[in-house]
Amino acid sequence: MSAKAALPLQMFGRRLVHLRSSVTSQNMSALRLYSTEKQPEEATEQKATESSPEVEKLTKELAAAKEQNAELMDKYKRSLADSENMRNRLNKQISDAKIFGIQSFCKDLLEVADTLGHATQAVPKDKLSGNADLKNLYEGLTMTRASLLQVFKRHGLEPLDPINQKFDPNQHEALFQKEDKTVEPNTVVEVTKLGYKLHERCIRPALVGVSKC
């Protein structure tokens, strides 16, 4: 083979060797890149796999803590409501004790008012003009009773005069029935004794007569 014919062959061989070297170098670079990229992914997957039980445990503990917190909050709200109700009941009892503590004393004074009322009614009205002493006595009784009723009113004690009202068993005590066509049945047509209430509480029912049904 001549030198001119061998020269192209040598150049082709050199190109082939260079090409193989280049391909091998690229493959190695790709392999290294693949290995470098894959290692973090595998490490992440392995780490996630290893941490899954711990995450699950923490999730369960968090759920249990939330449930316990909800139960404690519910108990706290119930206790707070119970305390508020108890405080309101106690305040009402104290208020009632202040208001109705004089109830028995008021009942005793009612007898005095009744006596003054009976005495006033017993005075013959037709003789007042001709008897100055009787007139002064009548006026004195009337003024005394009026003053006593004013004291009652200042302390929340007021009379109950249910004439012509519908009979109420909570405030009235029926002593008898009476025929009366001018009113509806079960109406108070006569009051023999006034009732009294202390701050809207009836402490003595009125003694009454009612119309027949």
Curated annotation (Swiss-Prot):
Keywords: Chaperone, Mitochondrion, Transit peptide. One of its GO terms (cellular component) is mitochondrion. One of its GO terms (biological process) is protein import into mitochondrial matrix. Pfam families: GrpE. Probable component of the PAM complex at least composed of a mitochondrial HSP70 protein, Roe1, TIM44, blp/TIM16 and TIM14. Belongs to the GrpE family. Essential component of the PAM complex, a complex required for the translocation of transit peptide-containing proteins from the inner membrane into the mitochondrial matrix in an ATP-dependent manner. Seems to control the nucleotide-dependent binding of mitochondrial HSP70 to substrate proteins. This is GrpE protein homolog, mitochondrial. It comes from Drosophila melanogaster (Fruit fly).
